[in-house]
């Protein structure tokens, strides 16, 4: 006779606890009718005879039939295609549960002792889950610092759904979205941006309507918001930055809240040493070992303001050297530069071989950044990405969404080293500006999202790209940016290809399906994942992810099903 689930105070009885339970893990045997209704990821309660109520999550389900065990009496019959009689077989199901804690009036307490064999197991109610969500689920009114990105795995149906939430109060601690191509990682980041774009205010950031954001868009995954800013109405404007000469340059916006701007860099935001390091690094493909003399000499040359004023008198603005002008004059006034270097040669300040290498590095920089891609205007005042631009996009009263369009349409024919240079310069400018905000006591916030993060902070031990001029400043932002309100959101398909120091600074991870070679790295960088989660990392369906870290409202890793974005017409949901 079938055992039907009992209802106790509105709860459905699912089964009974088996022996050898621990304070962190246990097994229960479901009732016959409950065998088909339970799912992995399902929340349950254990009402112990000790007077305690445990909250737990089903992590694994196993079905048993004595006639289908290896070497059983029916083994020979099975070989002949004869099935044993189901009605006389000993059949049962066992469900493994992870014990999350003990439900108390004050919330969820740590379980300091295990439940007892025979304790009944019930389906968890919304009231049981309130300590985890920290608000009344029955009202649907969540705090404004939570954004809903999907559903808890196992609770996706309309009649039985639980929201998957992200806590924005910890966004300044950085986060990463990882997964192989086609796993849904760009859809997930897009969903987060969409949710930020519909906020009407954030309680803990009273002056902000939403969090300003800048996205390094590698494949055009976020251009929907430029085409239709109504998808992200909380942003006063959606700005698309593209390279001069790209296909996007001639595609004017159709919406009044969209703006198209060509990428123009202001070198004056950086020190002579930083400029010199960039020029030499690009020339040597990032391998500065052995180029120390060149770097030191170029740094000294660019720092000698008096000599530069004398030779490049048109490059002086308000008594200051305009390095945009100096670099632009390299080709036209090469003789002046050669005269400076010749003076140093005669004074034995530089070896001829070093001087020649520095000249070649300067010419290479000019040809790549100015002649070919036109991203350094003749004067710094004509730069589009400058301190005023940062002030504008992070204005709390009118936060903006900025898309650095590095797709084939926005960066047609642009070398990776040039994209790295742009990202490095933007990050350096942001770091400098946000440090100044903090010194002045001014609170500013910006989410900086980088798609294909492995190209900008590569792990040089394993990733063939070899180097990135953006890596050093990206590491600085990862380690210190949180203090100033500069938040990172990294997106990558190969997390082990990203610099380990940068990845270790991420305090929240949204993990989609990963490559087998990345499983160990992911488990390490996240601080360890439960074995039952780790086993599934390589074969999760698209849209399914593991959420873990400080932006997770749950104090442990959980499976979540991310909702699809409202619109995504430029590329696949990857």
What are these regions (language model features)?
Residues 205-208, 220-231, 246-473, 547-550:
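P-loop NTPase motor domains
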Residues 171-172, 208-210, 396-398, 441-444, ...:
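Short loop/turn elements that form and flank the Walker-type P-loop nucleotide-binding site
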Residues 86, 470-561:
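Conserved ATP-driven motor cores of ASCE-family P-loop NTPases powering translocation/secretion/packaging/pilus
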Residues 2-4, 43, 95-107, 532-574:
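Phosphate-binding and hydrolysis-coupling loops of NTP-dependent motor/remodeling domains
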Residues 1-180, 187-195, 199-207, 441-444, ...:
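Basic- and hydrophobic-enriched, low-structure N-terminal and domain-boundary segments
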Residues 148-250, 500, 521, 547, ...:
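Glycine-rich phosphate-binding loop of nucleotide-binding enzymes
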Residues 62-64, 101-104, 172, 219-223, ...:
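Conserved nucleotide-binding/hydrolysis micro-motifs of P-loop NTPases
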């Amino acid at each position: 006779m079938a055992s039907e689930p009992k209802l106790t105070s509105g709860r459905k009885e699912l089964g009974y606890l088996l022996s050898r339970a621990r304070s962190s893990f246990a097994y229960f045997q479901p009732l016959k009718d409950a065998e088909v209704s339970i799912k992995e990821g399902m929340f349950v309660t254990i009402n112990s005879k000790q007077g305690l109520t445990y909250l737990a999550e089903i992590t694994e389900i196993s079905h048993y039939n004595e006639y289908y065990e290896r070497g059983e009496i029916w083994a020979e019959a099975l070989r002949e295609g004869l099935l044993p009689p189901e009605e006389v077989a000993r059949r049962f199901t066992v469900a493994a549960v992870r014990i999350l804690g003990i439900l108390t009036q004050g919330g969820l307490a740590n379980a300091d002792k295990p439940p007892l064999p025979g304790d009944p197991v019930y389906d968890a109610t919304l009231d049981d889950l309130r300590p985890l969500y920290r608000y009344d689920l029955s009202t649907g009114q969540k705090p404004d610092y939570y954004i809903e990105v999907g559903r808890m795995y196992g609770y996706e149906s309309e009649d039985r759904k639980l929201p998957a939430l992200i806590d924005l109060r910890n966004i300044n601690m950085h986060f990463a979205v990882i997964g192989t191509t086609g796993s849904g990682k760009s859809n997930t980041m897009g969903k987060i941006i969409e949710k930020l774009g519909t906020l009407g205010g954030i309680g803990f950031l009273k002056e902000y309507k939403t969090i300003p954001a800048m996205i390094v868009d590698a494949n055009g995954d976020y251009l929907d918001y430029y085409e239709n800013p109504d998808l992200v109405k909380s942003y006063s404007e959606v700005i698309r930055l593209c390279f001069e000469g790209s296909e996007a340059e001639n595609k004017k916006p159709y919406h009044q809240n969209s703006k198209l701007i060509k990428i123009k860099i202001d070198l004056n935001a950086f020190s002579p040493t930083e400029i010199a390091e960039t020029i030499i690094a690009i020339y040597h493909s990032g391998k500065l070992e052995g180029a120390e003399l060149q770097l030191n000499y170029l740094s000294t040359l660019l720092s000698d303001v008096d000599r530069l004023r004398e030779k490049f008198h048109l490059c002086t603005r308000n008594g200051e050297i305009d390095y945009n002008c100096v670099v632009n004059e390299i080709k036209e006034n090469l003789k002046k530069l050669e005269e400076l270097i010749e003076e140093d040669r005669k004074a034995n300040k530089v070896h001829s071989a070093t001087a020649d290498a520095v000249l070649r590095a300067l010419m290479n920089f000019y040809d790549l950044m100015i002649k070919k891609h036109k991203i350094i205007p003749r004067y710094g005042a004509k730069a589009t990405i400058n301190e005023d631009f940062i002030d504008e996009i992070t204005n709390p009263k009118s936060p903006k969404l900025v898309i650095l369009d590095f797709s084939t349409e926005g960066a047609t024919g642009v070398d990776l080293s040039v994209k790295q240079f742009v990202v490095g310069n933007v990050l350096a400018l942001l770091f400098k500006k946000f440090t100044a905000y903090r010194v002045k006591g001014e609170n500013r916030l910006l989410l900086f999202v980088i798609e294909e993060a492995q190209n900008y902070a590569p792990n040089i031990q394993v990733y063939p790209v070899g180097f990135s001029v953006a890596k050093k400043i990206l590491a600085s932002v990862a380690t210190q940016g949180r203090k100033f309100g500069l938040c990172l959101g990294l997106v990558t398909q190969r997390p082990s290809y990203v610099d380990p120091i940068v990845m270790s600074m991420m305090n929240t991870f949204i993990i989609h399906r990963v490559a087998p070679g990345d499983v160990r790295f992911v488990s390490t960088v996240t601080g360890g994942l439960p074995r039952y989660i780790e086993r599934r990392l390589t074969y999760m369906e698209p849209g399914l992810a593991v959420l873990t870290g400080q932006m997770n409202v749950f104090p442990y890793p959980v499976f979540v099903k991310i909702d699809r974005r409202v619109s995504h017409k430029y590329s696949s949901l990857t």
